[in-house]
Amino acid sequence: MIAIVVSVFMWLLAACLLVLRRGRAERNITYAALTIALATTLNIDVVYRTLDALAGGVNLVTLLADLTLMTGVFFLGRGVARASENQPLPIRFALSPVALLVALGLAITAFALIERGVTTTTFMLDLGTQSAAAAYSAIQFAYYGIVLAAMAVLGARQVQISAGLQALSPGVLVAGSVCGIFLSIVVIAMDLAHLSGNLALMTAIDLAYSPLYLMTFLFLCLGFASGPATRTVRAHSRERTARMLSVE
């Protein structure tokens, strides 16, 4: 159910951005919305089972969905970076293609070492006792956490130099990024608890997963949609004011 809700959020965001950002040269945010929407759609159970059966029934769609999501998060970070100047070196590296390629390479390597068995829609729950599976998940969420931390820093800087409605979009993005950082920490903690056999701890930590997952995507969607929406409203307001002045 959560996968469906998040997928709907992301496709709505993609549709909004395609309309509101029409004609703009900067496309990173639109690419991010489309790739993340695709990744979340691949994680819907019925879609996953159907496609994985076509791919041989060995959970290859898990890898496809996860690599797509990592790429989408990369585009998110690049989109935020384009709106900021004088970025520190650690932030530039965190949001660079090199960091993405390193993370993708590590994730693919870890995935190849997992004894995956047949199709399962609860991949980490079923296979999380394998060290390769724990590493595979941790690599992804470490990358997400790093990118989102960089986004939070850039967003906070943007809030400081903005006023009124202009501060809304970066402020909501900071909230989404912070939720995503905590989500990454929660997932890595769950991976370690599962790997160590402490299922009680894993279950306790899991209580935070769904709320953080939903809040992360909700705030990020609102943040990225509110930016172009605010600019559109302001543009219409300026046009209306100009017409009124010309009539006078």
Which residues does each PLM region occupy?
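Membrane-proximal helix-loop-helix units in multi-pass membrane proteins
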Residues: L104-I146
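A generic, lipid-embedded transmembrane alpha helix
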Residues: I29-L51, A65-F74
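Alpha-helical transmembrane segments of multi-pass integral membrane proteins
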Residues: R21-L42, A134-D191
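Short aromatic-rich membrane-water interface segments that cap or initiate transmembrane helices
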Residues: G56-T68, L127-A142, A204-P211
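The cytoplasmic-loop to transmembrane-helix boundary for the fourth helix
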Residues: S84-L113
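C-terminal transmembrane-bundle signature of multipass membrane proteins
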Residues: A149, L168-E248
